[in-house]
A protein has these predicted regions:
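Short, compositionally biased low-complexity segments
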Residues: 1-9, 46-50, 77-82, 112
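Surface-exposed loop/turn segments and immediately adjacent short secondary-structure elements
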Residues: 1-38
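Short alpha-helical scaffolding segments that buttress acidic/His motifs in well-ordered protein cores
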Residues: 1-4, 74, 151-156
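Short amphipathic alpha-helical segments
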Residues: 21-24, 67, 71, 131, ...
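Conserved polymerase palm-domain catalytic core
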Residues: 28, 32-50, 54, 86-204
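Conserved phosphate-binding loops in nucleotide/dinucleotide-binding enzymes
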Residues: 60-65
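Duplex nucleic acid-engaging cores and interfaces of nucleic-acid transaction enzymes
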Residues: 66-67, 71-74, 100, 108
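Electropositive, glycine- and tryptophan-enriched low-complexity nucleic-acid-binding patches
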Residues: 72-90
């Protein structure tokens, strides 16, 4: 809960804020916890928010309810020790103890080693186009708890509320939830491994 509080953020579709959540949880959390433990919990759809990008485009965020943020954060804290050791040393984004400054220093080290050609790559609309089947297959290789896998799958398919209309989410993982960055790294680790296999130097 402390991490969810620290990240603050806007309310989800239920309108419950971080400040309102303790009172809300006293009423609703016991039943929600029992639903999670018995594999019956259904995440609520995320609320669509559009953020302007410097290039004039828009970044689409999906804001979960505070309850779903709390559950996602708990899942991320359980899965990070499992998956993070598998990640490449050249991966810096959304990882504990790693940051963009370290990525820059690694690139500077490549330059000192004589590498002179650099390619800057942007994975356009990555979060919006995540393949659910591929991601769930990767998760299933390391997670034996079928209830947890099913819950993650429900988060991926929870849908997006746009102007009062529920849109299905058959693809993608919404930017805005605590779990999405870890899921992105799990999927992108396949790219990192292939780049390493080919002998490329990179920082992601």
């Amino acid at each position: 809960m402390e991490r969810v509080k620290a990240n603050k953020g806007a309310p989800g579709i239920d309108g419950v804020t971080i400040e309102d959540f303790p009172a809300h949880a006293r009423v609703h959390w016991p039943a929600q916890r029992a639903q999670i433990e018995h594999g019956r919990y259904r995440p609520q759809p995320v609320r669509r928010v559009e953020i302007p990008k410097p290039d004039g485009g828009k970044r689409l965020l999906g804001i979960p309810t505070v309850t779903d943020r709390l559950v996602q954060q708990a899942i991320a804290q359980v899965l990070t020790p499992i998956f993070d050791p598998m990640f490449s040393d050249s991966s810096f984004g959304f990882r504990p103890g790693r940051n963009a400054h370290q990525a820059i220093r690694q690139v500077q080290a490549y330059v000192k080693d004589g590498w002179r050609i650099a390619v800057d790559i942007d994975l356009a609309k990555f979060f919006d186009t995540v393949n659910h089947d591929l991601l769930m297959n990767l998760l299933g290789r390391a997670i034996a708890d079928h209830r947890l896998l099913a819950l993650i799958g429900r988060y991926l398919r929870a849908g997006v509320l746009v102007g009062g209309h529920l849109e299905p989410s058959d693809i993608g993982t919404p930017q805005g939830g605590p779990l999405s960055p870890l899921l992105a790294n799990i999927l992108l680790n396949q790219l990192d491994c292939e780049l390493q296999r080919r002998g490329h130097r990179f920082a992601r």
